[in-house]
Amino acid sequence: MDFGDLLRYAKKNSDAVTKEVGQGKYYSTKYSPPKKQSKESKQLSSNIQKFLQKKEAEEAEKKRLERQKLNDLLAKRDEKSKNKIRKMLKVTKSANKSVLEDAKDYEGAIDGHEAGEGQGDDYGYVSTEANAFYDKYIEKVRDVQEDKGFTPSRPQSLKDLSGTKERVKAAITREREEAKGNTRQKSSTSTLPSSATKSKESSVARSYSTSKTLYDPNAEKLEEERKKRQEEEQRRAKIKRPAQPPPMDFQALLRLAEKKQHEPVVFEVEKKKEPERLLSAREKRELEERQRQQEQRAQRLKMRESEGKETPKSIPNRMEPNGRIPKLNQAKPANAPSDSFKKPTAPQPTKSSASSTSLSSSNSHSSASRSSVSSSRPATKSAQLTARPGATASAVGKPSSSSSRDVPSKNPYAATSLKGTVREFPPRDQSSISTLDRRKIPAAAKTRQTPSSDVQRSQGGRQFPPADVKRRKPNEPPVTKRRIYDDDDEDEYDSELDDFIDDGDCEEDISSHIRDIFGYDKRRYQGIDDDDRGMESSFAQVQREEFISKKLGMQEDLEDMRMEAAHKKQKKLVAKISSRS
């Protein structure tokens, strides 16, 4: 086969391939759109057509009947009501036929409305004045061009592009320098290149700054990050760590090892804490109550200590030589001569003095139930004047504390009256002075009689003191009075109750003793709260129960009514039978 035959054979094959291209089997790479299926209009059957015609005829008949009914009603309307309606239509000019006709003929029927269709408002009514205003406004607005709210974005010039390039380059160089600075430790010399870069950045910024600055969010973000880093560096520089001791050398370590080698190694075994049982609501409340009581107790102790430090020791006021009771607010009297106290006073065994002692003792009993403020009243002051022959001499000039308070009383005389011990007046050592010395005492130094003779004369035959204020016999039990409730009593602290509750850690395991004695181990029981879940109910359950109870009540009422009716019926029957007989 020569070359010419070969070419002919190749051409023949190529022609055969080109002929079979349309018929050959292959996967097409081009996707043709889906063919639209044209729906053929289906011919309705004759029965359906008849049914539709019948339905249309029925609807037309229905409309005709409605129209006829309306006409009949309008015909039945009297002339008076028709006139009213016409007048109303003239006033409102709405749905008036004449107006609608004008609207049809109006030349300016615009916006594609058909003739007879209402244009605007009021059902087709057109005002000539309104149309004139509208035309005037349209002519004015027609020439006004639309003002766009935003200016069109101007195309970036070559200058702006160069600026952005420079900015990106500066940001990349800054990031590289920061990365290098973070890897190696920053020294004092490293501040120089950073300042150089800053100056470089500023020069770059000046080079690309245009007449109109463009907002760049990326540059703003980078600036914020840079500021944050600077603040962080400044904060770290401020925090100075304390100088640590130099590390131990090898010789020091060997010496320490020689010292420690003979010491026994102590391993501290940590105590395993057993998981505690969770508290119930009641136990939690009790625990909170105990903690609150402990806090209050601690506060009271602190207050008491501070009061003890602040209040100065009260100096007991001694009696004046003439026997007069010193006033609390009076200035301190001048120092009397020391021998003036040694002058005795004559005892007054009169009836009036005895009565005054009984009055003072009753006053002292009544003042014991009052507060420390009321103890400074004159009623209690008179109690210290009176003589008590059975009192001991050791009580002279010693103020006793009122109740269990450690705070010293301001008035020592009131304190002695509260205790019940009244110091003797005159003292025992002075009562032994001879009668010869008593005669020498001047009249001015003698104590005044209480109550005075002129007061006794004015009282006449009246009993003094009254019967209810008389002194009780010593063997009689004290009268129990109802104590007035005072809020201050709650804050009072009783020292006897200090040891009642032991809040300290107890070394003994009390629960183990209880376990041995009673054979009770609380670990075997679950800590279940005693609250009854069945007692709690939701709103729906309450409503359901109310509905059931209401239903039952109604049934019971109906049953009672039925029973009453039956009872009445039976009574009537009995009455009828009795009347017949």
From Swiss-Prot:
Residues 26-50, 145-495 are annotated as: Disordered. Residues 162-181, 218-236, 256-312 have a biased composition (Basic and acidic residues). One of its GO terms (cellular component) is nucleolus. One of its GO terms (biological process) is transcription by RNA polymerase I. The keyword Coiled coil applies. Belongs to the SPT2 family. This is Protein SPT2 homolog. It comes from Drosophila melanogaster (Fruit fly).
